[in-house]
Amino acid sequence: MSNYSVPKKVNESANRPCKVSALFALIFVLSSFLMANKPVVAQTLSLEQALQLAIQYDPLLKGNAHRKDRFNAEAEASSYWANPQVSASVQNLPTDGFAFDQEPMTQFKVGLKQQLPRGDENLYSQKKYQVMADQMSVESQVRKAWLKREVTLTWLDWVYATRRIGLLDKEKSLLTQLLDFTDSRYSQGVGAAAQQDILQVRLALLSLDDKYVEAYQQKNEARSALSKWFGAPLDESVSAPLTQSTRDAIEVDAILNDSNLSLSSFLTVIENSEPFSILQHHPEAMLLQIQTQIEAQNVNIAREQTKSQWAFEASYGYRQDAQNGASRADFVSLGVQVDLPFFNKSRQDASIAAAASKMSASETDFRLKVNELAANAEVLKSRLSALSERKALYETALIGETRQLSEAELTAYTTDTGDIGDVVNANLKQVQVQDDLLKIDIERARTLASLAYLYLPTHAHFFE
């Protein structure tokens, strides 16, 4: 902040005609300010672009695709029986000559054995892996919805900090204009301008430094937080979108871009939906339902462990004719094996009970998750309603009132019926109201993003 010198006051009676020239100077400064604040074309990152980049480069989504392929392969593999076993042996070979035709029991034996699955274990294992593959698809839906919410919230923080700097620039410009106007009145001896008037405006200008530091800190932190979703820092040339008015929409449509819903339609969906009912179909809740299905298959697999496992085998034994030429018949053997899982019944019952308890716990988790989502939805709906009321109040009343107050205080000071402190406060109040409206717009957009996270995936479930 540059220093401003305060000249000595000259004779007032000699400078009455300068009052008009001071007013013209103020108009000239305002015109220069407007010309200097034309929009400059820059590379901006819109919310829609940020969302697309975050989803495109998210490693977890790519990992879920690989995990889904893995579970589909596991499902196919689990449908097959165990590999058959082939055996070959020479049996009953005499040790006194090792002749193959010496003893009638000597034979070359080839066998084949096939073990069957235990009950329907393979069927339930296949179903389990199929459900786990479906779980990866739903988990990707949750991740996309979560990414959209988090990226939107971070992007809004970035936009708020950027636009707040714009408001601070506007506040600085107003105070600078007021300083020039007051300085001109004082130096030319117009009206009752005093040295204290200039000092008051200078003090207000100096106090902006702290606000600038805070705003730039918020902007840099939000920018750094946003870059983590892209896997690389944002280029310095990339900036947040700026508008000429804080009342412009903050890309709310981008929050709803995948739903084919307008903002009014989305608000109607929220208003007419019963959260505790509709949010049962939210992907977060569906994940727990799918987990319950997985645990149900684990219960079935545990029950199949109580059944016997069978194995069948067949063998062929070749015998060479006797040394005296007598013919010897070959041997064919058939057999069956079965285990007896009846001696560890207590362990098996405990395994079934554990699997069943885990399934019941998953069902409870589902109900808790639905309650949590529904309660959060109710809070967000109430917050959105209050923010909409505040937004309407600011736009229809406070903005205009503060503008009129600022003009009235400046007129009063110009005619020597007002105080410079009132002029400064009125101008600061005008910018403060605009900043408050910006905060409301940002918070309203954040609330809509959180509601979109809850309702849009559920809406897509019903209208697929």
Task: Mark where each language-model region is.
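Acidic, low-complexity, intrinsically disordered peripheral segments
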Residues: 2-3, 17, 40-41, 226, ...
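Periplasmic alpha-helical coiled-coil/stalk elements that build and connect Gram-negative outer-membrane
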Residues: 3, 8, 12, 16, ...
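A broadly used, surface-exposed interaction patch
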Residues: 110-114, 118-135, 140
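Bacterial N-terminal signal peptides
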Residues: 22-36
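Boundary at the C-terminal end of the N-terminal hydrophobic targeting segment
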Residues: 36, 40-44
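A small-residue-enriched
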Residues: 51-118, 232, 276-345, 350, ...
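Generic hydrophobic alpha-helical segments
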Residues: 51, 182, 275, 408-409
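Amphipathic alpha-helical coiled-coil segments
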Residues: 63-78, 143, 147-168, 201, ...
